Amino acid sequence: LLVIAGDNLFGFDISEFIDHFKSYEDPTLAAYDVGDLEKAKSYGLIDVEGDEIVDFQEKPDDPKSTLVSIACYAFPADAIRFDEYLAGDNNPDEPGWFIQWLVDQGSVRPFSFDGIWYDIGTADSYLEAVEFALDGDNIVADDATVENSELGDNVHVLPGATIKNSTVEDTVVFQDASITDADVTNSVIDEEASVHDKDLDGSLLGQNSRVQ
């Protein structure tokens, strides 16, 4: 069983992860060093000895390391013991608690990798991933409209979007959204949302929202 959270953006080839899993046939998870103890509080923390995970703590208040699970898992058939896990009155809501339980039951292997990883489940990290992907460039869809406007670095304008008389930087403008007479930076403007005569910085504007 292969499980990958949809808010992951990582740089490794998934076939490498699967090959690593097959070499052990034990539960395996991808592990990344976030390099920051405060960030580590938001993830499952891993303690590794050799080629085995010896401790797993789901979102600890006081992390001792920065190596975390990124919610990319592979399980052999004999490790899919959900009925047994739930029968023990364990937490049913987050997979990290199941991993913590598995570590107590037997061998769980890490697949440690370098390079990029972004948890794009928040607006800030999503924009960080966009910045990495665009690398200072802009992408404007062929049927988007940009008139009398200045686009700074890392702007992605999707089909049907309209930008007029505005300055936009480090922002994603989704389908059929519009920005008029505004300065918008570090923001996500969702589908069919509109900004008129208002300046935004660090905003997440939901679908069909209006700011004016």
Regions found by a protein language model. Give the residues of each.
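Conserved beta-loop-beta/alpha segment of the NTase-like Rossmann-fold superfamily
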Residues: L1-G50
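Catalytic-core segments of class I nucleotidyltransferases/pyrophosphorylases
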Residues: L2, I18-K22, E52-D119, A123-A133
